[in-house]
Every structure is written in structure tokens, then in C-alpha cells.
């Protein structure tokens, strides 16, 4: 319908309406006092005239002029601030506006009239309210005509009723828009979510307008209405009523009375503010298209509206992130980071609550609660106590809500005051929102603010004045001029320890103490870039350096004046010339760069270098400042052996005389760090920032590749300090010196793939092999020997820890301990922390060790050299990948590694498969003597479960813990925590008893009454009692054979690469053995020929000169000593490959001999030649006897036979021999350990039995106290579909997670309620697992006491590493017999090595009242067999042959089963082969069942790979 008056024609009103057709309601007919008072003269309307001026001059005012009564309309115009706010322009205030000219939202300082803005807003809110009255409403049109001073607001949807009010005798549109104190919101019993409340609203807009036009059309009343008011609602025109079309709408057009607002026109500020309000409505009104000046506002919803704000800002260059959530139909909330204190944008029923209110507090408080716990956890190491308002200061909250009957602090409705309980709805933020909120940057912003606050506190501790004398800093040797006017010329020397300080002080004697100060650092400086402020504030070295240098945190030192406040003008680092010394230099540079980068740019930092090697010959002295420089000199100097070589591993090696020499040649030893631009800044940041992990990886990877290439090309290593080096850039220092420490840090932390060792472990093994001790040796003594033999330059305490770790054999440590633990080396009680002092415990090589590292391999390894001393090899080469046998953990620079343990016997089989050219079988983590269960979640994760069983309605028994969960920690952190109660919850457990030993676990736990039933209904007991963990294989990082770090995706990949390296060594070993045997054979042949020639007088040596003897032997074609020559060739080959030259005793003697004492070259040559034939001429005369002659000839023939045997053998044969020898020795060693463990358990049980009170009756079983109870109902751990799907989803790429959900495995069969067939109570997943075992290729001898299952999965990629203590949620599991836990093993191979066994004879059923006698070390029948055999069948089922690959069955114990409730007879068909031996548990009503006791393995056979099981060992109940 058109807006023009011409379209309205005067027609008769509808019959049902009583108002006259065209008659205007005169003022006389209006009975309302307020309306009568609305008829005023021009003088009456001039309400802004000052009352004080009415009287004029000084004439005293009349009482009537002082005390006046005003009408409602007069009061509104006279005191507008009560109703619409101020009518004065505000001061320039930052506000969000929409710039219509540039079409963008912006925040700028504006000045506007709040009253004018309010009357516009009242009309806009009315339009938005109509959406609540009529959900079909979908359009709002806003027009702001600046030139005409005209604003219109149109909305469709249900119009105003066009009918006469029967009480007030006026039309309803006129009543609600032209009569004060009228409203539809006076019924407080009606719950409304609209903006109107007090009955002013649009009337205020009418009153403050020179013209106000209302147009509405009502489809229900089939009429359209139009009326105009002028002169501040004091005059109104006749309403025009016409028949309407089918359209419903309402339109308000008004011209604000600018004079009342002291304005001449609608300025840009108010227009832009009104435009932004239009955008508010568009964002807060769902399903409504809003048009502004004819153009649709492009906002689809509240989230789009929020992004319109946040897109104006960024966080460290990235767009601001938002967390958004719609809660129900009435709440929409969003959160973003605020850098300007707490900000909020909120709407209540479309009203813009610019000052917030209780709705904003309600939402913001929830958001703060989400953050405060995580932030407090991060601040645990600091002294800061964060408050909620401090978090709130970094939040930008957006709220759009619908509130029932809201109340406000004033008519301006800027603050909502309604209490939260009256909102009519709740807004509970979800975990999904919390997760999104954690990524918007608020936590980081709060932490940054905390650091700033702490920095401010730190700065308060800094000295504000420059002083020449300092007190309270121990060991400081202050420069005399420090802190004076000459302080810029002073240099502070930071030394690495007290010994280096002594060296520096000695050197100062030649340069003076006026300009140089010395301060020793204790160890390595803190990495301040990643340390928290509390660490920095508490760090003595940092505080001392700041005080000595006169630094202040708040100063940047960018100006000369600031720089002059320092006590020293230079900082010089004097550290050892090794990698750790480089790290100290880097940390000092990092300290200055982090807080005062401008000092780095001023070249404030220097270093003092000292020689690492000196070569001396007479008065000539050559100094070398890096090992590569020394190696290069040695290669280019023919007579280098004539020099005396001395290595300087630390500054303490230098003498005071040498210190003076260093300081005299300050030009050579003083190296300045030169700033060379942003590249230097980036290099320092990359080396020390936690955020640059990936960059550090790339940096180190590139360096390792370059090192490998140079090595392959035979090039020397690069070094930083040449003879003419006077300065280095920070980038060069990081890339060419600091990188050496970072690589060394990785070598110390991450093992090598080939031998699985870190350098310390390799040194220990090298020393043990070299010592070849036949007797046990004290650990402390062995550590000292290792340091001496292998040139170990660090503390021996670390070596002692390494030795102890190599000898530990408790569950979760080593699968094969290479050293024997003779004494207390730690147990699973405290994870090895309970080991005795190294002074009291002994060790020696394990018999298994040399079978893993054959002595023959020592001849083909590449040994390292240090200080001309042959030390450990680059890596050993065991016969199987030891890194998989014992696992590995470590955190280096840029990388970390975590590799679980695997079964050595399975590794032997995989190696044999590779030798035979067959593919490997999949491996699962395996830990020696672990009685729990390991189930595969996906290709890179395994769930590790402990063991729990139910003893009665309120008692459970825990007999195994997950890997790496130590007994003492479990008791303190889990069980004691479950004993705590709260007001709302009773404790889970009331008591527990401990029966474990140092090798076994047993907790008997008493639960609160009824708690067990409650837990079983809701959760898995493994979850409740923290008996589950996750083992990840996603972080398997190792050094390869070439010394480069690589990431491996599976143990099979590691085995394959190991196989390639090991194969090459077997080829080399064969070549070496052939060479040495051939040399020995040749030597014996020469000796035999020489003896025969001497006997036959063909050789006469008596009374001849040495030279003549040599000539005779050469003439008769006797070879120079073949063995000696061959060994010398091998030694030279090794030295050439290593790039080192080892000085033997002759070389060392030659160096000490002066030139004038040297023997002639001719005589020396004769001596050398004669020594080559000493093996002939040096033989004893007894060798000429017939017996010795024949013995020599026989030895020669035997040696030739050995050569022929070796020639026939392939490298495969050599490897097979080593593997078989290893397995044989391992079996013997484990048998000895098992015997010792059984004896230990038996002794412990006897002690417990003796201590217990015993009554009359049969003797108590001594093993029941420490071993699993025979009557326990084992809870079978299972991985349910939901958990598996969770990990599959975690491992998918982000895009794939949305599009494609992982395929869930089939749900296990559910346990039926009582009355079902008892066989259904067994573990539902067992039959499926058994079927998969064969296809997956598992072998039952993988473990006798662990349980490993593989489930199908997809290939994933994950960054998780380590054994995580995680809730692997699974459904409640059925219970099975306790004994089944100890031998459930999955066969990882297809080898049919276990022969089928005949079924065992049937067993008799026991009376039900008698408890089943479980063997604590026995297993039961397989679950697969149970499904095939009903236990309640009336007819006895025929015996079936055992499956081909089934485990051997054994005789049963008497009274194996419990009889039925009706009688004590044996159930029909229940024998060992046909009955699963399930009986209904006493607590049958709960729906649980108990698996009957397992059988003893009395006389079972064994295959070649599995040692014969002893009586009482477990029968594998689930393997094929």
C-alpha cells in the first residue's frame, strides 16, 4: 500500500464499529484529563522558558509562579532526560557505527544526542517485537532521509487492530500511538518476550517529532488506518480509514523536532549510529530480512553479525576467532578476545542493552568458570592468584536473548535488571562451546597479562640508580670502574663455573682490574624465553646478572642515555669450547635478546674462546679452537706425530701461565657477536622458542643431511673459528656452533635404531665387554671404570643411574636386562625409584648379553676416538633390534621418542621371516611377566588393561596394573582418592588390604554397600579403578645408521631397516673371519715349513747378522708375519674410515725421544723387518721336537678346515646360528628367573600364613594371600565400538571427520537377563577374537602371561606419544574365572607349530555349595568352545576332536563344577571337552555369571619354540 495520503479515501466504517465515518473526535468528547490538557496555546508550549525569568528583573515571584503543576505531556517536554535520556550532545565517545557512505562497520569517536537516538530506537524495537506476535513476519524496512529530516520504519506481519476501543471511544491505533500511558504490556501475569513495557515507547517519538504519521493495515479487520500528528503530538489530523487489501503491515514515519535536540539537521554521527542499529536488528532477529534505505542488509544470523565486529581486529596477525553457540530457541551467545578490557554487545528482546545487565553477567560468569581452572593450572608454578574479573577483562561477549517480561534500570533500557531465576529460560554452555572458547586466545591473553604484571613486579626490584659498589652478590669480582662515568668501557666476564673464574682472574693480572669484572655462573642459565616469571624472579643467576649489569626490565636501551645507565658496556661469555659451553653462550644471548633486543643490536655481547687442542714441539706451539681444525692440520702435517698433543676439555685444564697468555693476546681470543639484521633475531628465536619446534626440526634435519653428505664425500667438518676470525654473526653462531649442542642433546636423549642405545648406555656396555668381568662388580666401581675406559666427561652419578636402568627387570622395565641385578635395583612398587645406593649393589654382564652382541662383531664395528683413545663404537649391532625389545623414551631438541617394548621371540621370528624372504607379522607391545591384557584400538594405539575380579557383593580384587602404573603410586593416587567422600556422594571404597610382593600385585578392596551393583550398571570397573591406559606408537623417532633422525610408523619398519644394517655386518663378519683364518693358516703353514727346513738343516741362522737372517728368509719365500700384517691392514682401514689416528706405545715413545737420540734409519729398518719374522725365528727350541712338529702340522690342517667351513657358510647361516644360540640362552635365563620368582612368592606366602591367625581345620593354602583368588569372578576387559570409533575419528583428517564417519565394528552380543542359557554369560567378543587370531597370524608363544588382541582398524596418523593414563570407556563386561587372565595370548603367526591334543577325560561335577577350587596359576577352556556346547542340555553331547591348532588340554581338578540348584548330580553332557564349565554365580539375580575354575596343565607337550610348561602353569584359554 502506498504511503501517500491520496490513496486513502473516506468510506463508511464497518458495521460492527461504532465510530462515525468521517467525524473527528473533538476535544470536548475526550474525558481524559491528560488529553484535555494537551490543547495548549503557543505560550503554554514554550516550556523551555526559564521560570526565573518570568517575573522579570528583581521583582519577587508569586507563589503560583514558584509552585506549578504540569500535564504529563508538559512534564515529558520539560524533563526529557527522565524519559528519553539527555537532549544535549555527548562528548566525543568511541562507539560502533555503520558508515553508510563507505558501507562498513567501524568504531570511532562520535558525538550524538541520546534522546534522539532513543526515540528512533523505540520505533525500531516495536517493529522487531512484531516478530514475536506474528512468526510469519519476515521484513523490516528502514529509511533515513537526512535531507528531509525524515525517518520511516516499516514491518510486515500482523497489523494493529483497526477498530474502536469500546472504553476509550477512539480507534486502537490512535489510542496506542497518540495517547499517553496506554500499552498492551500491563498484564504482568502474561509472559511476553517483547521490548515494550511501560506504555511510553512510540508516544515519546511522537511527542519529540514535528510530524508523526502512522500507517497500518489489518487483514483480520479488513481495514487500513492512517493518521498524522504534528507539533509534538499536540495536534492530530483526522484518521483516514479505508478498506484494506490482503496485506498486513505497520509503518511509522516521523520528523524529529531537531530544535528540541538543539540540532539543525541529522548529522553523520547520528545517521551512522541509526544505521548500525538497523544492523543490530538484522543480526538479532531470526528469519527477518532488514532493508536499510532500500538495500537489504547482508547478515544471515547472529554469528554473521558477531563476525562483522571481530573482522575489524586481529590477534598477532590472525583474524579474531569466535566461539558461537545457540542454546535452545531463546539464547545465542558468542565469545571473542578483547584487547580493550571487558566488552559486550547484547540484546534483550531486540533491545540493545548497551550497558549489559544480568543476562550478560549470567553468560559471562559461565565463560569465566570455563577458563579459570585451566589458567590456574598454568599458574601453579607462579605466585600469581588469578581473579575472575582479570579473566573477564580479556573477554568480548555477545548475547542475543529473549527474556520474559524484562525489567530495566530506566526508560532508556540500557541495563537489564531482571533476576536470573525469572528469565523464563536457561543458557547452559556446552563442552563443545568450551572447546571452541579455549582456542579464541583468551587464555594466552591472560597469561600475557600475567607475565606483564609479573614483569612490572620484577622491574620494581631492579635498582633505579647507578651505583659503583655492590653488596650481597657472592663470588663477584667487580670492575673498579663499573658504575662510574667510565662504565661504558668496562666488560663483565661470565665464566662457566668457579674454576673458569679462577682462570679469568689469573688473566686479569695482565690487563688490570679497572675495566674487567668476573662473575661465575652455576651451571646453565635459565631459558627465560620459556620460563615463567616466578622462575625468572627466583633465579639467582638472572637476578645477579641484572644487578651487576644495572639492567632494568622496563628500559629498552634504544637511546644513548638509557645505555649510559648500565654498569658495564660489554658482556663477555667465557665458557668451555665444547657443545655444553656453546649452549651456555646461547642461553646468555637468549637472555639479553628476549628482554633487551636493542642491546643485541648494539653488539653488547662477546665471547672469549680458548684452545681445545694444543700441539707442541720444542718452542713451537700450535693452538686449535675446534676439533675439525685440528684434524685438518693433522692431515696436512706429515710429521704431526713429532708434536706433543694435549686436549683441553674444559677451562680448568689451562694453567695460570696459559691464562695470562690468553689475555695478552686479547685480539685473538676475544670474538665479538655482530648483529646482522632480522635473520639474526629469527635464528635466536628459532633456537630457544617452544613455538618454533617445527622450524627447529627442519634446522636440525638440514644440518644432519649436510653432515651426512660431507662424510660420504670425504670432506672435513666445517668449523666456525678460523685463525683470522674476529667476529661472528648470531645466525652463524646458531647454525654452525649451537647446532652441535642441539644435535648432541638429541643423541643423549634419543637412541640409535641399530643397537637401541644412547651414548651413556653404549659406553657402559663397551666397558663391560672390555673388562670381561667373571665376577660381580660394585656399581659405583663400574661407573668409575666406564668413565676411564670410554672417556666419559660428565658426572659419574649419571653413569650409575644408567647402569641401574640396564639391570632392572621388573614388570614395565626391560624385557631383557643386559646386566644382572645383584641387590636392590628397584621394583614395580615405585617404578625403580626404590633402588639402593650404587655403593651397595653389584652387577655383571648377563649371560644373554653376549649372545645378542657376538664377540665376532667387535671386529667389524666402527669405533670412535677421543683424545687419541679408542672408545666405544658408533653403534653396536645386535642380532635383533634391541630398541624394540626394551623400548625407549626421551625428549631432545625438536624431537621426542616413545617406543613400547615388544616380545624378543616374536622379533626372532620376524627376522627369520625376513631372512627367508617372507613378509613380517604384525607386532603388538609386550611386557615380560605382565599379567594384564593389551588390545589394539587402531594401528597406532593399544589399550592396556590391568586385572580385576569380584570376590563377593562388596569386595573386589586387583591383581595387575596397567604398564607404567606403579603399585605405590596407584595406592596413593587412586585407591586413597576413592576412599574420600563428599556431601552428595558416599565413598566408593571403605577399606583395602595389600598382599603384593615386589613382583606381584594384589589389592583386596572393600566397597561401600551397594556400590558394586551401582558401578556395574553405569561404568566399567576398569575405568572406575583406573586400570586402563593407552600405549601409543605414534612417536617412534630414532637415529638411523647414518646418524640422521627419522620417524618410523611401525615396529615392522624399524625391524626392516635394522635387518638391512645387520645383514651388511654379517657379510663383513664373514669376510673378516675368512681373512683372519686365512692369515692364521698361512702363518701356521710358514711355521711348519720353517721347522721342517730347520730340521733338515736347510736354514742356518746361527752366528749371522740380523740383516742376513732376514735376507735368507725372504730368499726362501717365507712371508712376513701374515697375522700381524693382516691386523695392521685392518687397523689402518679402520683409522682411515674413522678419520682418526691412534697413537700406539711405539708412537708415544718416538714422540718423547729427542732427535739427537734417535737411532739411524737403516738400523730401524732392519729391526722392523726382523720383527716381521719374529713368529719364525722367535719360536722356542722345543718346537723342533717331533711332537711339536706334528702338532704344528695338525693345527695348520685344522685351520685350513675351518677356512673351508666358513667359506661354505652364508651370512644367513651365521645369523640363524646366532638367533638359535640366543633363544636357547634366553630360555635358560628365564627359567632361572622363574624359579627365583616362584621361590620368592612361596616364601612371602609362608610368612603371611604364619602371621595370620589359623583355626582348626585343614591347613590353609599358603599361596592364597599373594596370588589371585581362585574364587574370583574375573572382569573381562573389552574395547567397545564407541571407544574404537572415538579414536578412529581422532585420527582422521579434519575434513574427513565431517564427511565420513569411521565404520564401527560390530557390537558384541549383549548379556541376557537371568533365565537365559548360561553359555551366553561368557565374554561376547571371545569367539570373534579367536577367529581373527588365525588370520592375523598371532603365535601363542608370544607370551605365557600376557594377553594381546588385535582389532581391525584404519591407518591413522597421530601425534600422541607415550603411555597415556586415559579413560578408555567401555561397556560393563561379563565376569569370567580369575585364572583365565594369566595366559590369554593371541597368536601372531600362521605357523602351525602347536600339535593338536586329544581331549582330556571327563570331569565330575561338584556339589554347588562347595566353592570351585581355582588354581591361581591355571586357565580355563576357550570361549569359542563354550559357544559350541550348551551347558544345560539333557542329552550328553558327543565328544569332539580338538581344533588342529588348539592349546593342549589337561586333566581337571576333582570337583571342578558346581551342580545345579535342584540336585548335586553332574549336569548331562558336562565333561572337560564338551562343557564350558560355567555355573551360575550366587549373585545370579544381578545378571552376572561366573566362569568356572580353569584346568591344570598336568602334562602338556610343547613345540620347539615354546618351553615346556610346568605343573600349575596357565593353559591358553583363548588361542587357537
Swiss-Prot record:
Q: Where is the active site?
A: 840
Q: Which residue ranges have biased composition labelled Basic and acidic residues? A: 12-34, 1283-1320
EC numbers for this chain: 5.6.2.2
Q: Where is this region: Disordered?
A: 1-40, 1249-1520
The UniProt record gives the binding positions of Mg(2+) 2 as 576, 578
User: Which part of the chain is the Topo IIA-type catalytic domain?
Assistant: 750-1219
Q: What does this protein's record comment on cofactor binding?
A: Binds two Mg(2+) per subunit. The magnesium ions form salt bridges with both the protein and the DNA. Can also accept other divalent metal cations, such as Mn(2+) or Ca(2+).
In what tissue types does this protein appear?
Answer: Expressed in the hermaphrodite and male germline.
Name any one Pfam family assigned in the record. Answer: TOPRIM_C
Domain of life per record: Eukaryota
What GO cellular-component annotations does this UniProt entry give? chromosome; cytoplasm; nucleoplasm; nucleus; spindle
Cofactor(s) the record lists: Mg(2+); Mn(2+); Ca(2+)
Q: Note the SUPFAM superfamilies from the entry.
A: ATPase domain of HSP90 chaperone/DNA topoisomerase II/histidine kinase (SSF55874), Ribosomal protein S5 domain 2-like (SSF54211), Type II DNA topoisomerase (SSF56719)
Transmembrane domains' residue ranges: none
Provide the binding site for Mg(2+) 1.
496, 576
Catalysed reactions, semicolon-separated: ATP-dependent breakage, passage and rejoining of double-stranded DNA
Going by the UniProt record, its keywords in alphabetical order are:
ATP-binding, Cell cycle, Cell division, Chromosome, Cytoplasm, Cytoskeleton, DNA-binding, Isomerase, Magnesium, Meiosis, Metal-binding, Mitosis, Nucleotide-binding, Nucleus, Topoisomerase
Annotated function: Control of topological states of DNA by transient breakage and subsequent rejoining of DNA strands. Topoisomerase II makes double-strand breaks. Essential during mitosis in the adult germline and during embryogenesis for proper segregation of daughter chromosomes. Required for centromere resolution during mitosis. Required for chromosome segregation in anaphase of meiosis I during spermatogenesis. Promotes cleavage furrow stability during cytokinesis upon the presence of chromatin obstructions.
Question: Other notes on this protein?
Answer: Eukaryotic topoisomerase I and II can relax both negative and positive supercoils, whereas prokaryotic enzymes relax only negative supercoils.
Q: How does it assemble?
A: Homodimer. Interacts with nmad-1; the interaction is required for localization of top-2 to DNA. Interacts with gcna-1; this interaction allows the resolution of topoisomerase 2 DNA-protein cross-links.
Instruction: Write the protein's name.
Output: DNA topoisomerase 2 top-2
Species assigned in the record? Caenorhabditis elegans
- Give the gene name: top-2
Amino acid at each position: 500500500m502506498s504511503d501517500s495520503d491520496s490513496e486513502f479515501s473516506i468510506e463508511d466504517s464497518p458495521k460492527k464499529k461504532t465510530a462515525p465515518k468521517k467525524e473527528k473526535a473533538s476535544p470536548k468528547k475526550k474525558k481524559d484529563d491528560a488529553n484535555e490538557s494537551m490543547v495548549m496555546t503557543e505560550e503554554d508550549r514554550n516550556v523551555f522558558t526559564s521560570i526565573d525569568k518570568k517575573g522579570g528583573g528583581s521583582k519577587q515571584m508569586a507563589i503560583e509562579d514558584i509552585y506549578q503543576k504540569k500535564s504529563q505531556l508538559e512534564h515529558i517536554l520539560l524533563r526529557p532526560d527522565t524519559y528519553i535520556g539527555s537532549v544535549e550532545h555527548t562528548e566525543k565517545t568511541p562507539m560502533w557505527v555503520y558508515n553508510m557512505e563507505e558501507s562498513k562497520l567501524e568504531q570511532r569517536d562520535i558525538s550524538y544526542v541520546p534522546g534522539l537516538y532513543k526515540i528512533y530506537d523505540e520505533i525500531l524495537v516495536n517493529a522487531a517485537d512484531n516478530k514475536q506476535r506474528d512468526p510469519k513476519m519476515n521484513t523490516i524496512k528502514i529509511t533515513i532521509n537526512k535531507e528531509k529530516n525524515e525517518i520511516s520504519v516499516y514491518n510486515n506481519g500482523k497489523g494493529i487492530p483497526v477498530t474502536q476501543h469500546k472504553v476509550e471511544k477512539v480507534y486502537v491505533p490512535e489510542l496506542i500511538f497518540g495517547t499517553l500511558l496506554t500499552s498492551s504490556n500491563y498484564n504482568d501475569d502474561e509472559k511476553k518476550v517483547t521490548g515494550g513495557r511501560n506504555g511510553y515507547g512510540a508516544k515519546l517519538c511522537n511527542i519529540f517529532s514535528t510530524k508523526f504519521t502512522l500507517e497500518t493495515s489489518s487483514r483480520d479487520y479488513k481495514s487500513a488506518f492512517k493518521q498524522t500528528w504534528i507539533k509534538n503530538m499536540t495536534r492530530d489530523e483526522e484518521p483516514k480509514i479505508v478498506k484494506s487489501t490482503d496485506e498486513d503491515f505497520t509503518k511509522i514515519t516521523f520528523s524529529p523536532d531537531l530544535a528540541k535536540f538543539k540540532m539543525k539537521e541529522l548529522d553523520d554521527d547520528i545517521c551512522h549510529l541509526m544505521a548500525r542499529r538497523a544492523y543490530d536488528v538484522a543480526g538479532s532477529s531470526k528469519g527477518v530480512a532488514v532493508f536499510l534505505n532500500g538495500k537489504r542488509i547482508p547478515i544471515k544470523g547472529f554469528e554473521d553479525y558477531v563476525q562483522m565486529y571481530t573482522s575489524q581486529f586481529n590477534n598477532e596477525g590472525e583474524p579474531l576467532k569466535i566461539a558461537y553457540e545457540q542454546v535452545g530457541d531463546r539464547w545465542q551467545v558468542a565469545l571473542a578476545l578483547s584487547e580493550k578490557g571487558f566488552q559486550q554487545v547484547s540484546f534483550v528482546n531486540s533491545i540493545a542493552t548497551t550497558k549489559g545487565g544480568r543476562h550478560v553477567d549470567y553468560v559471562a560468569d559461565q565463560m569465566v568458570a570455563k577458563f579459570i581452572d585451566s589458567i590456574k593450572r598454568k599458574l601453579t608454578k607462579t605466585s600469581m592468584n588469578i581473579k575472575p574479573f582479570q579473566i573477564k577483562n580479556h573477554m568480548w561477549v555477545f548475547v542475543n536473548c529473549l527474556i520474559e517480561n524484562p525489567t530495566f534500570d530506566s526508560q532508556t533500557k540500557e541495563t537489564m535488571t531482571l533476576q536470573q531465576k525469572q528469565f523464563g529460560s536457561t543458557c547452559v554452555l556446552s563442552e563443545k562451546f568450551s572447546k571452541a572458547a579455549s582456542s579464541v586466545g583468551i587464555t594466552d591473553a591472560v597469561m600475557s597479562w600475567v607475565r606483564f604484571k609479573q614483569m612490572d613486579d620484577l622491574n620494581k626490584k631492579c635498582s633505579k640508580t647507578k651505583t659503583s659498589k655492590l653488596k650481597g652478590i657472592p663470588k663477584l669480582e667487580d670492575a673498579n670502574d663499573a658504575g662510574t662515568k667510565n662504565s661504558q668501557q668496562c666488560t663483565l666476564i661470565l665464566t662457566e663455573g668457579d674454576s673458569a673464574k679462577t682462570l679469568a682472574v689469573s688473566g686479569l693480572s695482565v690487563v688490570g682490574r679497572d675495566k674487567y669484572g668476573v662473575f661465575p655462573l652455576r651451571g646453565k642459565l635459565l631459558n627465560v624465553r620459556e620460563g615463567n616469571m616466578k622462575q625468572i624472579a627466583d633465579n639467582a643467576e638472572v637476578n645477579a646478572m641484572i644487578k651487576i649489569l644495572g639492567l632494568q626490565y622496563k628500559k629498552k636501551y634504544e637511546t644513548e642515555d638509557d645505555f649510559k645507565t648500565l654498569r658495564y658496556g660489554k658482556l663477555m661469555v667465557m665458557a668451555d669450547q665444547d657443545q655444553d659451553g656453546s649452549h651456555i653462550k646461547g642461553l646468555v644471548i637468549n637472555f639479553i635478546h628476549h628482554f633487551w633486543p636493542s642491546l643485541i643490536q648494539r653488539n653488547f655481547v662477546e665471547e672469549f674462546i680458548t684452545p681445545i687442542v694444543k700441539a707442541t714441539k720444542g718452542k713451537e706451539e700450535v693452538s686449535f679452537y675446534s676439533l675439525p681444525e685440528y684434524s685438518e692440520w693433522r692431515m696436512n702435517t706429515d710429521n704431526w706425530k713429532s708434536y706433543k698433543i694435549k686436549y683441553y676439555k674444559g677451562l680448568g685444564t689451562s694453567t695460570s701461565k696459559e691464562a695470562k697468555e690468553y689475555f695478552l693476546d686479547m685480539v685473538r681470543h676475544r670474538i665479538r657477536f655482530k648483529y646482522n639484521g632480522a635473520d639474526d633475531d629469527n635464528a635466536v628465536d628459532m633456537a630457544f622458542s617452544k613455538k618454533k619446534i617445527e622450524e627447529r626440526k627442519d634446522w636440525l634435519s638440514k644440518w644432519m643431511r649436510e653432515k651426512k653428505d660431507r662424510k660420504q664425500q670425504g670432506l672435513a667438518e666445517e668449523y666456525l673459528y678460523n685463525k683470522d676470525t674476529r667476529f661472528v654473526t648470531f645466525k652463524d653462531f646458531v647454525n654452525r656452533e649451537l647446532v652441535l649442542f642441539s644435535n648432541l642433546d638429541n643423541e643423549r636423549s634419543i637412541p640409535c635404531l641399530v643397537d637401541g642405545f644412547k651414548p651413556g648406555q653404549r659406553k657402559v656396555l663397551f666397558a663391560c665387554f672390555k673388562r670381561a668381568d667373571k665376577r660381580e662388580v660394585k656399581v659405583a666401581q663400574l661407573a668409575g671404570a666406564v668413565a676411564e675406559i670410554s672417556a666419559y666427561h660428565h658426572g659419574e652419578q649419571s653413569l650409575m643411574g644408567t647402569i641401574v636402568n640396564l639391570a632392572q627387570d621388573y614388570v614395565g622395565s626391560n624385557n631383557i636386562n643386559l646386566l644382572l641385578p645383584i641387590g636392590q635395583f628397584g621394583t614395580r612398587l615405585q617404578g625403580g625409584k626404590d633402588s639402593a645406593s650404587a655403593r651397595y649393589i653389584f652387577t655383571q654382564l648377563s649371560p644373554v648379553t653376549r649372545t645378542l652382541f657376538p664377540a665376532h662383531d667387535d671386529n667389524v664395528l666402527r669405533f670412535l676416538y677421543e683424545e687419541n683413545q679408542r672408545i666405544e663404537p658408533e653403534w653396536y649391532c645386535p642380532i635383533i633390534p634391541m630398541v624394540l625389545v626394551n623400548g625407549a623414551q626421551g625428549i631432545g631438541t625438536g624431537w621426542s621418542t616413545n617406543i613400547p617394548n615388544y616380545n624378543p621371540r616374536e622379533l626372532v621370528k620376524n627376522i627369520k621371516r625376513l631372512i627367508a624372504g617372507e613378509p613380517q607379522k604384525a607386532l603388538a607391545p609386550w611386557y615380560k611377566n605382565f599379567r594384564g591384557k593389551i588390545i589394539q584400538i587402531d594401528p597406532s594405539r593399544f589399550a592396556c588393561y590391568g586385572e580385576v575380579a569380584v570376590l563377593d557383593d562388596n569386595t573386589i580384587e586387583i591383581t595387575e596394573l596397567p604398564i607404567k602404573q606403579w603399585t605405590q603410586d596407584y595406592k596413593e593416587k587412586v585407591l586413597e582418592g576413592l576412599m574420600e567422600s563428599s556431601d552428595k556422594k558416599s565413598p566408593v571404597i571403605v577399606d583395602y588390604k595389600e598382599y603384593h610382593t615386589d613382583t606381584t600385585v594384589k589389592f583386596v578392596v572393600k566397597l561401600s554397600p551397594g556400590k558394586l551393583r551401582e558401578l556395574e550398571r553405569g561404568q566399567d570397573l576398569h575405568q572406575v579403578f583406573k586400570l586402563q591406559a593407552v600405549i601409543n606408537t605414534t612417536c617412534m623417532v630414532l637415529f638411523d645408521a647414518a646418524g640422521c633422525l627419522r620417524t618410523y610408523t611401525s615396529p615392522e619398519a624399524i625391524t626392516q631397516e635394522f635387518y638391512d644394517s645387520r645383514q651388511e655386518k654379517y657379510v663383513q663378519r664373514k669376510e673378516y673371519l675368512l681373512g683372519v683364518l686365512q692369515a692364521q693358516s698361512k702363518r701356521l703353514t710358514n711355521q711348519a715349513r720353517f721347522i721342517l727346513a730347520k730340521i733338515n738343516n736347510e736354514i742356518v741362522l746361527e752366528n749371522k747378522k740380523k740383516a742376513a737372517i732376514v735376507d735368507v728368509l725372504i730368499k726362501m719365500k717365507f712371508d712376513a708375519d701374515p697375522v700381524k700384517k693382516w691386523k695392521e691392514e685392518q687397523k689402518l682401514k679402520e683409522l682411515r674410515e674413522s678419520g682418526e689416528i691412534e697413537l700406539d706405545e711405539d708412537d708415544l715413545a718416538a714422540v718423547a725421544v729427542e732427535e739427537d737420540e734417535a737411532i739411524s734409519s737403516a738400523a730401524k729398518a732392519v729391526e722392523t723387518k726382523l720383527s716381521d719374522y719374529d713368529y719364525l725365528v722367535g719360536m722356542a727350541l722345543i718346537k723342533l721336537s717331533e711332537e711339536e712338529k706334528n702338532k704344528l702340522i695338525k693345527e695348520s690342517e685344522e685351520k685350513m678346515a675351518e677356512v673351508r667351513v666358513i667359506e661354505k657358510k652364508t651370512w644367513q647361516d651365521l645369523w640363524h646360528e646366532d638367533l638359535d644360540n640366543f633363544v636357547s640362552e634366553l630360555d635358560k635365563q628365564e627359567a632361572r628367573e622363574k624359579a627365583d620368582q616362584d621361590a620368592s612368592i612361596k616364601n612371602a606366602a609362608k610368612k603371611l600364613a604364619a602371621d595370620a591367625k589359623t583355626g582348626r581345620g585343614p591347613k590353609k593354602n599358603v599361596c592364597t594371600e599373594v596370588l589371585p583368588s581362585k574364587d574370583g569372578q574375573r572382569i573381562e576387559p573389552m574395547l567397545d565400538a564407541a571407544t574404537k570409533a572415538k579414536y578412529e575419528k581422532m585420527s582422521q583428517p579434519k575434513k574427513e571427520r565431517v564427511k565420513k564417519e569411521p565404520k564401527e565394528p560390530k557390537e558384541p552380543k549383549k548379556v541376557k537377563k537371568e533365565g537365559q542359557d548360561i553359555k551366553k554369560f561368557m565374554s561376547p567378543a571371545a569367539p570373534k577374537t579367536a577367529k581373527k587370531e588365525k588370520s592375523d597370524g598371532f603365535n601363542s608363544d608370544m607370551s605365557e602371561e600376557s594377553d594381546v588382541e588385535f582389532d581391525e582398524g584404519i591407518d591413522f596418523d597421530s601425534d600422541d606419544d607415550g603411555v597415556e593414563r586415559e579413560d578408555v570407556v567401555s561397556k560393563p563386561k561379563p565376569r569370567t574365572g580369575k585364572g583365565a587372565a594369566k595366559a590369554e595370548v593371541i597368536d601372531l603367526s600362521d605357523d602351525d607349530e602347536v600339535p593338536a591334543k586329544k581331549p582330556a577325560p571327563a570331569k565330575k561335577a561338584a556339589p554347588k555349595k562347595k566353592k570351585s577350587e581355582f588354581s591361581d596359576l591355571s586357565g580355563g577352556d576357550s570361549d569359542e568352545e563354550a559357544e559350541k556346547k550348551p551347558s544345560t542340555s539333557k542329552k550328553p553331547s558327543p565328544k569332539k576332536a580338538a581344533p588342529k591348532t588348539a592349546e593342549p588340554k589337561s586333566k581337571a581338578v576333582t570337583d571342578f563344577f558346581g551342580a545345579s540348584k535342584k540336585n548335586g548330580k553332574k549336569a548331562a553332557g558336562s565333561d572337560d571337552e564338551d562343557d564350558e564349565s560355567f555355573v551360575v554365580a550366587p549373585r545370579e539375580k544381578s545378571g552376572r555369571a561366573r566362569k568356572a575354575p580353569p584346568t591344570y596343565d598336568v602334562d602338556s607337550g610343547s613345540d620347539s619354540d615354546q618351553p615346556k610348561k610346568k605343573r600349575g602353569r596357565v593353559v591358553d584359554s583363548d588361542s587357537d
